[in-house]
């Protein structure tokens, strides 16, 4: 862990996970082994990052990221959310928001605008939107649904 990092409560960093300077890791997040996080990156609350990957852009709250050279979003951290007591309805709402923000092909600003309208009053979605609006390094992109399905079959 390098200089000026802010680490949330109840995080797990596996073997040889490395944080460069000025990193923020949210509460209840997991960073897999042999994962490197570049300087100034933010990792949101309840995030799961798989092992052996590099993170160069922000990872939004409640998501799962993985992938060698550059981590991409593979969807929600569903297992982690369930383990922390998130209801099925709450997870379904987050999944719907994830799809709008990352799967429907909107530019980021347009996706945020649409999500603010559709999910008004939903605190979890508001947390994602505020996180995205506060990015300085950009937000990691999602893989295609086909790639996500292939990954799910392997796990």
Protein language model regions, located:
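Structural signal for interior beta-strand "rungs" in well-ordered beta-sheet cores
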Residues: 1-71
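Terminal amphipathic alpha-helical/low-complexity segments used for targeting or macromolecular assembly
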Residues: 68-155
């Amino acid at each position: 862990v390098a200089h000026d990092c802010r680490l949330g409560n109840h995080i797990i960093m596996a073997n040889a996970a490395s944080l460069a300077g000025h990193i923020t890791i949210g509460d209840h997040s997991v960073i897999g082994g042999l994962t490197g996080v570049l300087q100034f990156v933010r990792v949101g609350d309840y995030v799961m990052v798989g092992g052996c990957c590099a993170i160069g852009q922000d990872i939004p709250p409640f998501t799962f990221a993985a992938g060698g050279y550059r981590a991409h979003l593979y969807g929600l951290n569903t297992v982690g959310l369930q383990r922390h007591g998130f209801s099925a309805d709450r997870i379904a709402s987050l999944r719907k928001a994830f799809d709008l923000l990352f799967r429907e092909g909107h530019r980021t600003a347009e996706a945020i605008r649409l999500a603010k309208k559709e999910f008004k009053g939903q605190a979890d979605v508001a947390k994602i939107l505020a996180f995205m609006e506060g990015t300085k390094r950009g937000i990691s992109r999602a893989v295609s649904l086909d790639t996500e399905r292939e990954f799910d079959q392997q796990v």
